[in-house]
Regions:
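Active-site metal-binding core of divalent-cation-utilizing nuclease and nuclease-like domains
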Residues: 62-68, 107, 111-157, 171
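Short Cys/His-based metal-binding microdomains
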Residues: 63-111
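Metal-dependent nuclease catalytic cores in nucleic-acid-processing enzymes
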Residues: 112, 174-190
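Domain-level recognition of nuclease-like catalytic cores that cleave nucleotide substrates
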Residues: 191-258
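Helix/loop segments that flank and initiate small ligand/metal-binding modules
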Residues: 1-78
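Intrinsic disorder
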Residues: 38-41, 66, 82, 95-102, ...
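Short beta-strand-loop-alpha-helix junction that forms the active-site gateway
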Residues: 152, 157-172, 197-200
Length: 258
C-alpha cells in the first residue's frame, strides 16, 4: 500500500489513537483512564468515539452518506474532527478554544495560588485575580503562568489541541520561550513545564517533568495526581461541549471550574 493510502486510512480511522501511542506520557495514562471511567455516560461514549474518529462531524457524515456536504458551518474548510476541536479559524476568532484553554489554566493557577510562599502571575482574560506574567517576563514574552517563590521561578505554558499536533505544538512553544528561560536562568533557578495536552485530555510526553515540576513547586504526590486528573477532566468536558456546539452560534460560557 502506498504511503498516501496509509495516511488516508489513518486520517479516517485511527489517527488519534496512533498519535496517543506515539506522543502520550505513560506516567499519566492511569490517571486519564480513572477520569474517563467516572465520566457521565454521554461524555464517556463521546470520548470513546473521539478516539476512533467516528463522531458525527460533517466530514464523517458526508462520507457515510448522511450529509449533503462535508464542509464546516463557519468556514469553507472540511469539518474534520481536528477542525472542530482545534482548527477552525472562525471558532478561534470567537475564542471557543480559549474557553477550554483558560478553564484548564484557571484550575492550575488557583491550585498553585493556595501553596505557601508563592506569587502567581497568570494570563487569563476572563479573570482579574492574578497579576500579569509580563511583570516578570516583559512584553516580548508572556507565558500562561509564572510562579515566583524566593529565588525560584516556575514557568508553565499550556497548549491544548488535536492529538496529532501535540508534539508539534510542544516544539513550537519550546522554541518560542527558550530565550525567556535562558534570560531568567542567568539570575534565578528556573523550572519550565511545557504542558501540551490533547483535546481528549491526553498529556504529551513533552511534559515528562510534570511530576517533578509540581513536587518542586510544593505539591505532594497526592495533590499532583489530583491536579492532573482535574486537568484531564476539564479538558474532556470542555472538548465535549465544543463539539456539541460545532454547528451552533457561540456565547462564551463562564470558565469551567470547581
Amino acid at each position: 500500500m502506498k504511503k498516501n493510502s496509509i495516511e488516508t486510512s489513518l486520517t479516517t480511522q485511527s489517527l488519534v489513537i496512533k498519535s496517543i501511542w506515539s506522543y502520550a506520557l505513560p506516567s499519566t495514562a492511569r490517571l486519564w483512564s480513572s477520569v474517563l471511567e467516572k465520566m457521565p455516560r454521554n461524555i464517556y461514549t463521546f470520548s470513546i468515539r473521539y478516539l476512533g474518529n467516528c463522531l458525527p462531524n460533517r466530514s464523517n457524515t458526508h462520507r457515510w452518506g448522511a450529509a449533503v456536504s462535508g464542509l464546516c458551518s463557519f468556514c469553507p474548510n472540511r469539518q474534520t474532527l481536528g477542525h472542530v476541536i482545534g482548527g477552525c479559524k472562525i471558532s478561534l476568532e470567537e475564542k471557543r478554544f480559549n474557553w477550554r484553554h483558560n478553564s484548564i489554566l484557571l484550575s492550575l493557577a488557583r491550585a498553585t495560588k493556595a501553596l505557601p510562599f508563592v506569587t502567581v502571575y497568570c494570563d487569563i482574560e476572563e479573570c482579574q485575580e492574578f497579576l500579569s506574567p509580563s511583570i516578570i517576563s516583559g512584553d516580548s514574552f508572556r507565558p500562561n503562568m509564572i510562579v515566583v517563590r524566593e529565588k525560584e521561578i516556575f514557568v508553565i505554558e499550556l497548549t491544548v489541541g488535536f492529538e496529532p499536533n501535540m508534539q508539534k505544538n510542544a516544539l513550537r512553544k519550546q522554541q518560542r520561550y527558550k530565550p525567556l528561560i535562558d534570560s531568567l536562568s542567568k539570575t534565578q533557578s528556573v523550572h519550565f513545564l511545557n504542558l501540551s495536552v490533547g483535546a481528549a485530555g491526553i498529556i504529551s510526553n513533552d511534559a515528562a517533568n510534570i511530576f517533578n515540576w509540581m513536587k518542586n513547586l510544593g505539591f505532594s504526590q497526592k495533590e499532583s495526581e489530583y491536579l492532573i486528573r482535574k486537568t484531564i477532566n476539564i479538558c474532556i468536558r470542555t472538548t465535549y461541549y465544543l463539539f456539541c456546539r460545532r454547528d451552533k452560534p457561540w456565547e462564551t460560557p463562564k470558565l469551567l471550574s470547581w
